């Protein structure tokens, strides 16, 4: 089975799906986390490129520790995700490339706008990819 976890930010997949990802990866399933923004906001001490770089390193370490196959992070600025046609097409492309059997994402009524828009993108992409 191929699992694709699509989150708005680096660390969203780890917070929400790490247990499932570890169990599936340990059983030989392919697991990928896709982060739609760079994670450059939301910290009280650093932000922008410095925080995005830190999150990229954290993602690499998460991949190693969780034993998952891949983590991809897009360059969309944190806090600026919008459910555009262009991004929907990119999500569709990633679902097809990974040959995802299961896609997990945010709930549509989340408190964070990036989480809500990520959910919309994935819902729309899932409809279009079939």
Language-model segment annotations:
Residues 1-6, 82-130:
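Metal-dependent de-N-acetylase/amidase catalytic core
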Residues 1-98:
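Active-site rim/loop-helix segments in enzyme catalytic domains that contact anionic ligands
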């Amino acid at each position: 089975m191929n699992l694709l976890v699509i989150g708005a930010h680096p660390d969203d997949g780890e917070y929400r799906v790490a247990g499932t990802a570890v169990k599936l990866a340990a059983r030989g399933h392919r697991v990928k986390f896709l982060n739609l923004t760079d994670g450059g906001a939301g910290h009280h001490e650093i932000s922008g490129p410095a925080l995005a770089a830190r999150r990229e390193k954290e993602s690499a370490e998460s991949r190693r520790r969780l034993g998952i196959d891949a983590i991809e992070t897009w360059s969309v600025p944190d806090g600026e995700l919008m459910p555009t046609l262009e991004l929907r097409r990119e999500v569709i492309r990633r679902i097809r490339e990974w040959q995802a059997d299961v896609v997990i994402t945010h709930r549509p009524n989340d408190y964070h706008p990036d989480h809500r828009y990520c959910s919309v993108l994935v819902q729309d992409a899932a409809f279009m990819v079939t």
